[in-house]
């Protein structure tokens, strides 16, 4: 947990753009503070309520004026349904989040933008065949469609041209089945060559990963 927080702080410090995706307006409180109800404590110890538009807008504004000050922020609402809240509860939650984003766009017009991932799935596609078997998460076809819309709206022509190369490098930086094999060492060397050919892209973490793999095989 602490390592994840440290990584987040470093990412916020070094990035000039961020994406904030809102999932649900429902929270759990204990002793007046919002907490994560994931500690196997009895539900009776927590108070569950839906945040107001103002509370959400104020909390995110604090981030925009603090750690995210001077950075461009893209706001989205997750199209994933929180059916644990019930159909009506999920609808009220998503509506609250959407109105809160409108408030944030009005408060911080130069810093924030909105990408309609939620509307694309629920209004543009609006068909159960675009959902996975659980009828909660978007299906692969829907994910690909939303990604195409996203890339077309926020990426430059040059970024879209480089995207396949970037995706290939990022996808390759995963735990291999046989990290000590000669074949994997050769693969890592090729990936470092690929990274060297794209100096305009920040591949620091991926390059460090491939170098570690090469050291293991040395």
Residue ranges of model-derived segments:
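Active-site segments of SGNH/GDSL-like serine hydrolases
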Residues: 25, 65-91, 118-120, 124, ...
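Extracellular serine-dependent O-acyl
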Residues: 72-74, 95-127, 149, 159-165
């Amino acid at each position: 947990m602490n390592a994840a927080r440290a990584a987040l702080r470093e990412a916020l410090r070094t990035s000039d753009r961020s994406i904030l995706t809102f999932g649900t307006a429902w929270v759990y409180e204990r002793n007046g503070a919002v907490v994560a109800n994931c500690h196997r404590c009895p539900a009776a110890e927590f108070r569950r309520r839906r945040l107001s538009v103002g509370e959400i807008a104020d909390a995110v504004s604090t981030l925009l004026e603090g750690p995210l000050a001077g950075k461009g922020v893209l706001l989205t609402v997750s199209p994933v349904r929180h059916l644990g809240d019930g159909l009506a509860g999920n609808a009220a939650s998503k509506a609250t989040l959407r109105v809160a984003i409108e408030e944030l766009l009005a408060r911080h017009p130069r810093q924030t933008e909105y990408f309609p991932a939620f509307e694309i799935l629920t209004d543009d596609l609006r068909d159960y065949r675009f959902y996975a078997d659980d009828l909660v998460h978007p299906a692969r076809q829907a994910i690909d469609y939303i990604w195409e819309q996203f890339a077309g709206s926020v990426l430059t022509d040059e970024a879209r041209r480089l995207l396949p190369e970037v995706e290939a490098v990022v996808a390759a930086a995963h735990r291999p089945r046989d990290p000590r094999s000669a074949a994997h060492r050769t693969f890592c060397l090729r990936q470092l060559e690929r990274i060297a050919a794209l100096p305009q892209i920040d591949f620091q973490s991926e390059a460090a990963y491939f170098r570690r793999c090469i050291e293991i095989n040395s």
